[in-house]
A protein has these predicted regions:
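Periplasmic/extracellular loop-to-transmembrane helix junction in inner-membrane transport proteins
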Residues: 2-3, 32-75
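Hydrophobic alpha-helical elements at and bordering transmembrane segments
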Residues: 50, 59-63, 67, 97-104, ...
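Transmembrane alpha-helices
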Residues: 130, 134, 166-200
Length: 209
């Protein structure tokens, strides 16, 4: 018991020492002035900027705008992606077309959508939302389609023998059985949505001047 306790404290101490060394190395490199201060600020300068941004409310405002973009884009991606994934699992033609497109687009880095968003929407909220939706959509489509295809057919047959109709089977049998796959796709879509939004917020203002 005591040995495990000291082992846990030792792991925490190692982590703390590591981060202290990282901050010290950061400060040391900053003091060397190899790079301009605006390219490589010191930890103290970063802390001061964050503190002043928090005090004047700009940090809170920027965080709220970012979260609003993220939640809205992610929500649209889910509302669009889950039904499309269901269609892919149900119809082979859609799987052979939209499914393949989704597989290809999912592999694209999020930043690839930024130039298109800028050309189509300019420096607007629409450009930001488009990039976030594209980051979310494809993972959700693929996960939903894969999950519904992997539901054992015996589940639906058992429900139909008890008088369940197609809609009831879909809502109460197929969707719950495929939930682990769908949730996994939602998690991946959330991670990709964050990554997409970061790329959009950095590059859209740059590309539009």
């Amino acid at each position: 018991m005591n040995r495990n306790k000291w082992s846990k404290w030792g792991a925490h101490a190692c982590s703390l020492v590591f981060f202290i060394l990282v901050v010290w190395a950061w400060q040391y490199l900053s003091d060397l002035r190899v790079w301009k201060p605006y390219l490589f600020p010191s930890p103290l300068e970063v802390w001061e900027y964050l503190r002043s941004s928090f005090q004047d409310g700009s940090l809170e405002e920027a965080s709220w705008i970012t979260m609003k973009r993220l939640v809205l884009g992610y929500g649209i991606g889910l509302v669009t992606g889950i039904p499309l994934g269901m269609l892919c699992s149900r119809f082979q033609l859609i799987q052979n077309t939209l499914g393949l497109v989704s597989l290809g687009f999912q592999a694209l880095p999020s930043v690839c959508w930024v130039p298109l968003a800028t050309l189509w929407f300019g420096q607007t909220e629409g450009a930001m939302l488009f990039v976030v939706i594209m980051g979310t959509l494809w993972s959700v489509i693929l996960a939903t389609a894969n999950g519904m295809r992997n539901v054992p057919p015996i589940y639906a047959r058992a429900a139909r023998t008890m008088g369940a109709g197609p809609i009831y089977c879909l809502i109460h049998v197929t969707l719950p059985a495929s939930a682990p796959f769908v949730v996994s796709g939602m998690k991946q879509g959330w991670a990709f949505a964050w990554r997409s939004l970061m790329a959009a917020e950095i590059f859209v203002p740059i590309l539009t001047g």
